[in-house]
Structure formats: C-alpha cells, structure tokens
Amino acid sequence: MAKARKPKNEEAPGAKTSENTGAKVLHQKLFLSIDFKKRQIYGYTELEVSVPDIGIVGLHAENLGIESVLVDGEPTVFEYYPHHQNSETESNWNSVSDPASAADAAAMEYVGVLKREDTANLLINCCKPSKDLSEQLDSVTLENGSQSSGEAKQNVKLIRINYWVEKIESGIHFDGNIVHTDNQMRRARCWFPCIDDEYHRCSFDLEFTVPHNFVAVSVGKLLYQVMCKEDTTQKTYVYELAIPIAPRWVSLVAGPLEILPDQTNFLISNLCLPHDLSRLRNTMEFFHEAYSYYEDYLSANFPFGFYKQVFLPPEMVVTSSTSGASLSIFSSHILYDERVIDQTIDTRIKLASALAKQWFGVYITPESPNDDWLLDGLAGFLTDMFIKQFLGNNEARYRRYKANCAVCKADDSGAMCLSSSPSCRDLFGTHSIGMHGKIRSWKSGAVLQMLEKQMGSDSFRKILQKIISRAKDPSNSIRSLSTKEFRQFANKIGNLERPFLKEFFQRWVASYGCPVLRIGLSYNKRKNNVEMAALRECTAALDARLSVIGATSDSESRDVDAGWPGIMSIRVYELDGMSDHPKLPMAGDRWQLLELPCHSKLAAKRYQKPKKGGKPDGAEDNVDAIAPLENKTSIESPLAWIKADPEMEYIAEIHLHQPLQMWVNQLEKDGDVVAQAQAIASLEALKQHSFSIVNALKNVLTDSKVFWRIRIAAAFALAKTASEESDWAGLQHLIKFYKSRRFDAEIGLPKPNDFRDFPEYFVLEAIPHAIAIVRGAEGKSPREAVEFILQLLKYNDNSGNSYSDVFWLAVLVQSVGDLEFCQQSLTFLAPLLKRIDRLLQFDRLMPSYNGILTISCIRTLAQTALKLSDSISFDHICKLIEPFRNSDTILQIRIEGSRALLDIEYQSKGISSALLLFMKYLVEESSLRGQVKLCVHTMRLCQIAVGCDSDDCVDTVTLLDLLHLFKSHVVFNNELLRYYLFCIFQILAGRPPTLFGVPKEKPLQLVDVEACIEPKNVFLVPGAEAGEPSLSALGDAKGQSLDVAPYGVPIIPQEMFMPIVPELMLPEPVAAYDETQHLEPRMESQNQPSHENPIVHEIPSDVEGPTEELAHREANPPTKEPQKEPDVVSVSVSHEVKKSVIRIKVRPSGATSRAEGSARTIERSQGIVVRHDIDRGQTSSASVDAPQRISTDAVSISNQNHVEEVNSCHDVGSRMTASIGSVKFASEGDIFGKELQCTAESGKPSTSQKADNNNRTVPPSFLPLDHSMENEAQQKYASLQTLSIGKEKEKKKDKEKKEKKRKREDPVYLEKKRLKKEKKRKEKEMAKLVSSTTDPAKKKIESVAEVKEEEPSDGAMLIKVEPKTEPSTAEARPLPKFRIKLKSKAFNNS
C-alpha cells in the first residue's frame, strides 16, 4: 500500500512557489456580461480566500480595468500594476551587433518576462481599511512573510472585484459575433482576476449574460438559463463546477452556435457554426464509442459529468485543439463530410486524444512541474489504446515504432529529460511547446508502454483504475499524481521490484539518451549456434548525461555508464520454428558476446560428382552445388532471420547486420508490421540493390494482404532503388503496378476513379509521389516519370465516384513540385503548368475541402520557380501568388501564399530580407494561428540559412527590429508566437531552439533594472532565494534542432495530404555549437541592479555564508604556518552560476590525517557548519608543482598502488587543466615519484576587489571559539570517527571483493590483467638497471605550494598544504598523497 500523502498545503518538490503570501482561493464566482455590439466585457468576481496573517492577498490580473474591490462588503485599498505596460519600455540594446548578442538580449528579455508573470500584480488589503496599504507593507515582519496559510489559523474573507476587460486581445477574443477563450498559459488573468497558477485549484460558479439568441457554453454543469428581468433581449447561462481546477482550464465560447446532442449518449454535446453542422454530424458518428471505451477501460464514469465539444473556424483558434474542464475547443478544419477519406483517421485520433486529456491532465493533475511528463504520457497511452481498439493493432504498432524512431534521433540533449529540475521547473511550461514538446510526449508514452510490458497489461490497467477511483473518493479525494506515487503503484500493484523501478526511473525519466545497439552475427555450423556480438552506445554523450543526473565521482560515472535496466530479447527464426533468447544485457560491458543455440539441424550433404554415364548436357548434375549466391545462407545455416527486441520493450536504435537473404525473408514472411518496416529500411539503406531486393519490395507492394502503410513504404523504397544501372527496374514496377490497378488495358488510359477500397486508395495515392522522387545519375527525374505524372493529371476522371478526389489531385500536383526537370523533360513543363493553372481557376470557382487543391498548387508553383530560377522569373510568380494573401481568403490559403513568398524572398535576397518580410506579414496577419504558422516557417528558413556554408548573415538593423517585435504587445498576446520568436534568435546564434540551457540569473538582473514601475515584492519569504540550475545542466544542450526539415531544402512541404505517419526528418547540427555560449554572461558593462528598487526580488548577498566559514578557518588554521589572508575576499552577486573549485589535500602521514579528521568531528558535534571544501567562487590563478621524489627506502605495495582521484571540469569563467605524470621507478625497493601540476587561469575576475575588501564584515560564529573546549572534544569524539572510518573501509572492501569476483569470470579482463602484469614485470627490471647507475641519496623531496593572491571573484581555489621535510637515509617516511578534486558548487543554492 502506498504511503500516506503529505498535506496539500506543503509545497511539493519542484513546484513553483506561489507569489501570493500563502493566500488560497477556496471558491470563485464569475459574473460576466458580454456586449456584442459595443464589444465590451464587464462584470465582477467573488473569491472566498483564506487570508494569511500578513493580511495581503496577491492575485494575477492583466488587461483589466479594476473599478473597485470590496472585502466582506467593505471597500478596501488595492494596488494594481499591469505587467504589459512596461513591456513596451525601451531597452539598452546598444551592445547588439551580431546574432549571438541578439540571442542573449532576447533570452534576458524572455526569462525576465516569464519571471515577472509569476509575480502577483493585484495586491488587496484584507485588514482594516483604516491603515494605508503601503504602511502595512512596511510593517510586515520577517515571520509573517514566511508563514503559510496551512500553518496559520484560517481567516476566510469574501473579496469582490468589479472590473471590465480593457483589451480583448489576449486570453479572450472577439471574432465577428463569437467570443471565445484560448486557454494559453498564464492568460486566464487576462479576462478575470485569479491566482493564475496551474498548481492552485478551486471550484467555480459561472454566470454569463449574452443576447437571447446566442449560446454561451462553459465548463461544468449547466444548471439553468434564464431571461434577464432588466433586459428581455439578454439571457443568462449559469454553470457550476464543483471539482477544483486551475483557472487556466476555465473556457468560454459564446455566439450563434448550433447544438448537436449525441444520439447515443445524452451527456455528450457538440456545437459549431450553422454552416458546419452537416460535417459535424458525419464526423461525430463514432465518438460515443471512444467515450464509452474510456469509461470501460478505467471502470469509472466521465469525471465532469457532461462533455462539450465546440468547433470554431481555424482563424479563431490558436491551436487545432484546446482543452478546458469538460470542454474542448477544436478547429473546424478537422471536420469532414461523407465524401472525404484522408481526414478521417487524423480527426478521430485528435478527438480521442483530447478526451484522454480530460482524464489525465485536467481531472488528474501533476503534483509539480517534474510530474508533467507522467500525465502527458498517461493521456498518450490512453489514446494508443483507442487506436489499437478501433483502428487496429497494426496501426497502433506502426505509429509507436515511428514515434520511437523519432525519439531516438532527438533524445540527445537535456531538453529531452522528462523529469529534472533544469528541464521542467525552470522552463516555465515551454517544454510542452513545439517539436520538443511533441518528442517529449512521444517519449512519455513510450516509457509507460515499456512499464506496461514489464508488469503486464492487466496490472497497468489496475494502476490507472486505482488513480481514478482514488480521485473520486469523496472522503479522501486526491486528484494530483506524482512520479513517486506512480512508482509505488508499480511496486505494489504491478509487482515490480523496487531496485528495478529505481534504476528504471533514474535512467529513463530522470536522465536522457537512448541505447544504440550495433549487432553482428555469425552461424557456427560445428556448434549449431549463432555467435552474436553486440556493441552498446548511447544517443547522448556520457558527460552530458552525468551533468543531468548530477554524478561527480568516478564510481558514479561508472554507474551512469552501466547502461539500462533489463535484458533485451533476441528472437531467432529457424527453418523449423521460432525461439526467444532473452540474453542481451542492457547493462554492464558495452561489448557483449552471445551464443544462441539453434534447434534446427541441416542434413549433411556431400558434393556428388557427375556419373560417368550421365547425359552429355549435364541434366543430372547436382543442382545444390551450383545454387545462386542469394540462397547460400539458407543452404549453409538453418537461420531464416533474426529480430532484436521484437516486442519493442526498449526505446532503442538497433543496427542489426544480417545477410541480405535474411532481410528478404523477414520482409516476406514476418507478419509483424514493425519487422517489415525494419526490413524495408535496411534494404533501402544498402548501397547496391540486387534483383532480389527489388523483387521482394515489388511483392510486398502488390500483396493486398500486407498492411497498407508497409506497402507505401515499399513503394518509396522501390523509388530509391531505381537507377540507370538497374535499367530503372524500381520505376518500371511502380508504373506497372499503378497501371494494373487504375488503367484500362484496352485503351491504355486511366479509368474513372473508384475509391471504395480504402487501403488500396491510400497505396495508389502514394505511387505518383514515389515516382516523382526517382532520380538519375545527375539528380534529374527520368523522362518516363515526368510523362507519366502529366498523363495522370490530364486524364483524371472523378465522375461516378462517391468520394472526393481533392486529396488525390493535391498529391498529383505536389508530385509535379517534386520533379527535377532535365533538358529532355523540359518540354513537359508547359503542359504541366497549364494543368495547374486550370486547377487553380477551378478551385477558385468551386472551393475544395479546406482549400487543399489551391494550397498544393501554390506550393508546387513556388517549388518549380525555385528549381528553375534561370527560366522562370520570380517577379511573375510573386504577382501570381500575392492575391492569395488577401484577408478575405481562408486562413490555410493565406498562410501558404505567405510561406511561398517568404521562400522566394530568402532564395533571391537572403535571410535578412526574408526576416523583414516576415515581420511585415506578421503585423498584417490578424489571426493568432496564422502568426504562429508564419513564425514556425521563418524558423525553418533560419535553420536552413545557419546550416549553409554561405556568408549570408543577419544585419544589425534586422536584429534590432526583431527585438522590438519580440518586446511588443502583439507578441505578449500570443504565447506560442513569443516562444517561436525566441527560438529564431537562438537558431541565428547557432544554439538549440529551446529555453533549456539559457542562464536564469543574469537575465533576471537586467530585467530588474528595466522594470522600474512594478510593485515591491511583498510576498518574498525573506532569506530565501530562487533556485539556480547547475552549471552542468545549463551546458549540456546541443545544437540539434527538431523543428525543421533537412538543410538545403528550399521548401519544406507539410505531410498534410497523406495520413501516413511521417518519418521525422531531422537536420544536421546547425553549427559547431559552443556550449559555453549559453553560460558566458554577456553585456558585462551592465550595472548591477539596485536592491532598493521596489519591484525586484531582493537577492541576499552570497558573501555571508562563505565569510562565516572563513572566520572559522582563520581562527583554526589547518596548517602550522599562519594564514595571511583568505583566498576568497568576496563573492560577486552578478555571477551566480556555479563555479569549479580545486581542492588539493596533502596528507603526509596517517596520524596527521586522523588528528585533522578529529578536529572536523568536533566541529560537527558542536553544530558548527564548517565546509572545508567550500566553494569560493571563481578560481584564482595558482600552480602547485610536486617534483619527482626518489628515496632509497622501501615503500609498501599499498602506497605504490594508491589510486589518485582526479575529476576534471571545464568552467565557463576560467580555464583549468590538470595533469599527472607517469610513475617512474628509481630503485629496487619499488620507490616511485610522481609529477603533479595543476593550473587554473581565471577567466573573469571580479572588478570590485577593493570595495569588497573594505565593506566585508565577518559575522560572529555560532559558538565562541575556545581552544580548550576543542581539545576536550577532540579526545571525546576521536574514537567515534575511527569507528565510522572502519565501517567505510569494510563497505569498500566488500564492494571490491564483488567487483573482483565479477572480473575473474570475464575473459577479456583476465587477458588485460595478464598483459598488465607482464608490462609491470618489464618495468621493474628496467628500474633495477636504472637504480644501479643512480645515487638516490643526493635527491631531495620538494613540496611547494604557491598561492598567488588574485582579485576576489565568484570562484576561489583553496589550497591546503602540510609542511614537508627532507628525508634522510636513516629515516623512512611514507610518501605524501596528493588528492585533487574538481567540484562544481554554488553558494546559497536554495
């Protein structure tokens, strides 16, 4: 049974601290009147708030006009500071001169705005109104500021806020006669005051007054609708939501909507505009089945009672689907009528996914940002179950396989870490946006499916049912879920062992990187087994993974590099059957050698000589002796084919090298879609394509029993195999297959369309596209391919077909854009363009479904113009496309026209001109969704520009214009647009397009300087500081972009016509990305923020802790020599990133070490916190040289084999190198010397040394420093320390014994050990020869520690040196041990 949960008033680890002084909203009522004629929204809200002792309640409000505030019916004092007012203020961007500096400025602005948005800006005085609010704020004591509402006695107040919405452009929108919300992050505050935090929830009562002929639909249960007494033309809709939710999930849509109740389940209601009603009725025929399936699978009713779905025009919504509590808003472009085929699958999956998010994401919520992945993964898992149930197991497995491939390609940076502080808590929710968010969602679902494989589907289902039933329990309702709780459920209900779960979650959830396996095999005929060699690698570098996990020592490094938990299964298909071999360990040695026994045996065959009386033509010769090479594998071994991880139990990239015939066997005989897809990919990747490959792909294409997506993959693989060397065999097979299905054999022309066979329709639809990508030796399309596509366009006939051919024609037109014309095929260009023009004119008169045909024509014209720029004028194409950008055209066509013009502008004039044109289009575009699409396309153009080797760069004027746009109010209204603009800056600077790795502290200081009109942060808990990301976590993001297509492609077409799951195409790295660029703070000339500014979070000085510890050190110097001055004088507040520190310990004898350890034990026993390895900020320049030591006295073997522990690290502000010389034996007595040199060069010393020296004060210690007391305590606690040291040694010995036992069974290790012993023996013999000619008595031992005082900085190097004496020949002393540790620390990282 899981442990009892902590009370909810305690802050969960990783959760953002609320900026409302502990105030908690228990219940909120919202009363709004919407005037459609004047376009005004006004009303009031009532909040039942548990007020803390401070007496101040902080709320979030933006774009609102606050008329009055009442507390328990009495007017009160309030202060309101809109954040967006200072978003228009000018910034000091004089230092912006290149993309790197512009990216720094954008990051500083973005992080600063996100931090400000987390701060409450509507402050309400809930105490007696006689006292002025500013006076009360000044009288708040330290204790009041840190006390939470859970600890204090509840003081519930009723706060009423009368307000109106000033700017209806963010959060809530007027579009024609429709009012709707967009549910963006941190935008609920833009239409009603609230605590706009996803982890702060309350129940709601909602009332909306609209014209009587309009419908207002919102979250919760509709209690009633009533006509207004004052105005009979108005009607009020009253909703109640008893389940506490975050304000973000409150949605509203009001307008002339048509209601379509579900015919099967009355709890489901569908709404849309009148002209979409027929499509809505056709689309929703299946939905009650998905609704019922989820309830049956989870053994619970829908938690919110009623479920509403509203479909609005695409230009009104920000994304294609938006979730609210019991209400989902979709774009109407996903609706389809009975004549459309291609949109069906995508629409059903999208609706099922939105319903799954109602269960996991809205109803069951994450406990902290680090748990977002879990709810996202559970919603994706539930959607996969729907796909498996209603679309088939093949569809579900194929989609999961493609998603896993995409995850493996992208999971190489810390941005893909599912649950860690750097990747979740500090990203302000941006980790769920864009392609990174998509990949994270796929990875979350895949990780949960791996767990389901381990525990079984029934056990996993019971866990989900337990989560839902626990939330529905009225006595102890717990509706939040954490990763820790899920692990407990997996242990108790799933029967998975705790050690396995700990390792599983640590490796797959708390870290990143996927295994890469390279497997080769060979059949041993004598032993009748398969000898397999496997090399395990990782998609992420080891040092980057260490930085995320936080490992520093060598032992931790070995644990992280140990691999992944579990054993991978190998499935061997033989002539007599199939067998599974779970023998490939995913941990341990990277190289694995396996032997898999075979159960089938081959009969011994001997070569038979031809008979003397045989026929002269040799008809009786042995046929097996001259078998073709392709059948050699089946003759010499009983293996048919081999599969690694057949059940997809790992998210792994597997490169299996097996003979060609085995791949062919797997493709033709294995019925699993994943195995077939892997075989096609492997055959396509071969450099030479034999007849057997082409023939196998052709057989799969023509076999109607094969899954249609596999047949499409085979068609594209055939196109890749077609070449002049093979006489265009692949192309001929594609054309022949198409003609056999669609052509009339008598006249040789296409037959009228007949799309009743859906799988056959999808396969034939992909054939023209596959033919268009066939290339010759010079990269040009063969004449036969161009002529065939022209023939299909010319003779397309859809008369008598009950289904629309709009997608069919769109693919044909897009195929024209994929062609590469040569001199021989240029004659077909004019007829093709003429056909495209006819289709454009026809679509203008009779618009196609969602303008698909016009979009395809625009895209093809732009592609053709870019490829034939010498023959086609760009000006002519631009004049042809420009009219499609008119505001009266539908959104999809308008955006496609803008994309095409941006592509042409980039190809003709460069990236700067394209960015200027993008900013012009962005201002002209009225819809939020259109702005996002334009920004995403421009981001792809920037990826292409950065990836090219050309000198095309962005000028300073364009960068400044982009920065002004980034800071404008237009961008504030659109959270997605703001994020993608930030990504553009990062891409132009050669950085990854993500907020991960961007410094959080330095940008905040610049923003604090600018924000001079914001209120004082009265909610800050004194003494607390914002958490800092670790240095390693900030620097492990790579320059890998996931949102773009490969470089060099001038136009990136969307896979919008075909319902095939697109294979994620990832670009090459944008540039040689220096990870320290994110870490190196720029704009050093910026002044430090004034801490007297009433807005800023006051950051306590970092000097206090280190200075206090230095006081202890000065009072108790560790060496016999008196300390002059501490190396650390001050710590600069401007550079708060963790810095590396060098610690050098010289231990000349065991007695000294024990005495020193006892002293430290005394300090700990007295409560004195003295960190002898404390970080001192930025390192100073210093060098320590330990020359070679030679002694004639014998040294014990244990000292000789002492392992030096060295951890190296590269810091941002300094360059450090550490080198240890090799051991040199000088005498027969195993005497050795070691060279050790360690240098540290300071990169950025502090510029305020004198001021820090003068102003620094040493605070008093906790206890008086009495040396006599120390001596008594030393004697008292000496034995205690000795006991702890003994236990540690015993643990270390046990660990070493286990390690030795494992190594004794490893043949590779034994061979290395033998060679190492042989090498040591030779070195000893050489040392004897050298010692005979050397006089060791003349040598001296020197141990020098030079401490060079530098300017105080953010890091310091502490060097502790014990005095050394010269040994004599009559006295033997043990050799001093040098121990170097490079660790990364930070001050006050709380």
UniProtKB/Swiss-Prot annotation:
An individual GO BP term: transcription by RNA polymerase II
Biased composition regions of type Basic and acidic residues, renumbered to the chain: 1109-1127, 1286-1297, 1336-1347
CDD domains named among the record's database cross-references: M1_like_TAF2
Coiled coil, from the record: 1286-1333
UniProt xrefs under InterPro entries: Aminopeptidase_N-like_N_sf, ARM-type_fold, Peptidase_M1_dom, Peptidase_M4/M1_CTD_sf, TAF2
Positions of region (Disordered): 1-20, 1104-1132, 1240-1377
Family: Belongs to the TAF2 family.
Protein name: Transcription initiation factor TFIID subunit 2
Organism whose genome encodes this protein: Arabidopsis thaliana (Mouse-ear cress)
